[in-house]
Amino acid sequence: MNSLNNLRTNNPLVICYTNDVVKNFTANGLLSLGASPAMSQAPEEAIDMLTPANALLINIGTLTKDREQDILEIAKTANEVGTPIVFDPVAVGASQYRKDFCKTFLNTVDVVVIKGNASEILALINNDAKMKGTDSDDNLNAIEIAKEAHKRLNSAIIITGKEDVVIQDNQIYQLNNGSALLAKVTGAGCLLGAVIASFLPTDETTSISQLVEATSIYNIAAEKAEQLAEDKGPGTFMTLLLDALYQVTYDDYSNQSDIQEVQ
């Protein structure tokens, strides 16, 4: 399935309720890829924004009490008009406050995809799980966490890390592309959530092939950016990642993706 070319032909509108740290980078990343971002946070305009939209991204990176009801109202409106939701529970394991909100959110709203690192996804299904800020525990078994989260949360799950894990309809793939520099740029994971949202179809059930393609395209772009950055570091890499998202092609995905099905 060539979802990337379809994306660039149709310029899908992605409504982003995302955190304050990453709005600019997320918007520029989506524009570079070929999507159309709108950074909307007002429930008063939700129905107008979401009716023509292809997807909604909800990212709780800078969650506050004042924003809780707005997030819930916007997400419920997306459900009402049939706009698919990607949920990014940033640092959910770092505080009980975030765990409680995510539990309320997932009990109230239907989401198509939940994306996070292994520690974040574990915290959604295990209230005792802990995190240090947004950092993930590399010793966790991402595949087993993804399986359990998929079963309990009834959503596609994408776990990011050195290798990424994607599960949908009980099919599981491990994706081995990517760059270590992604972990050195604030907002790189948040941008991936928006990229995944831009690949979601509005008129059919999201397939695992679309989720695998979206995640792999992003990671292949990151590999290209790292090569071009040479040894210059994260600042150069961040700018080159936007260029790489603009330049990456479906042929790159076909020829360079490193994907393993997990039995």
UniProtKB/Swiss-Prot annotation:
The pathway is:
Cofactor biosynthesis; thiamine diphosphate biosynthesis; 4-methyl-5-(2-phosphoethyl)-thiazole from 5-(2-hydroxyethyl)-4-methylthiazole: step 1/1
Its BP terms in the Gene Ontology are:
thiamine biosynthetic process; thiamine diphosphate biosynthetic process
Enzyme class comes to transferase
EC number annotated for this UniProt entry: 2.7.1.50
Give one GO term, molecular function aspect: magnesium ion binding
- Which residues are involved in binding ATP? K115, T160
Write down the chemical reaction(s) this protein catalyses.
5-(2-hydroxyethyl)-4-methylthiazole + ATP = 4-methyl-5-(2-phosphooxyethyl)-thiazole + ADP + H(+)
* CDD domains tied to this protein: THZ_kinase
Q: Keyword annotations for this protein? A: ATP-binding, Kinase, Magnesium, Metal-binding, Nucleotide-binding, Thiamine biosynthesis, Transferase
* Ligand binding (substrate): M39, G187
Q: Which domain of life is it from?
A: Bacteria
Name the Pfam families on file: HK (PF02110)
Q: Which InterPro entries match?
A: Hyethyz_kinase, Ribokinase-like
Question: Which cofactors are named for this entry?
Answer: Mg(2+)
Q: What does this protein do?
A: Catalyzes the phosphorylation of the hydroxyl group of 4-methyl-5-beta-hydroxyethylthiazole (THZ).
Q: Cross-referenced HAMAP family, in alphabetical order?
A: Thz_kinase
The entry assigns this protein to a family as follows: Belongs to the Thz kinase family.
Name the UniProt record assigns to this protein: Hydroxyethylthiazole kinase
Q: List the gene name.
A: thiM
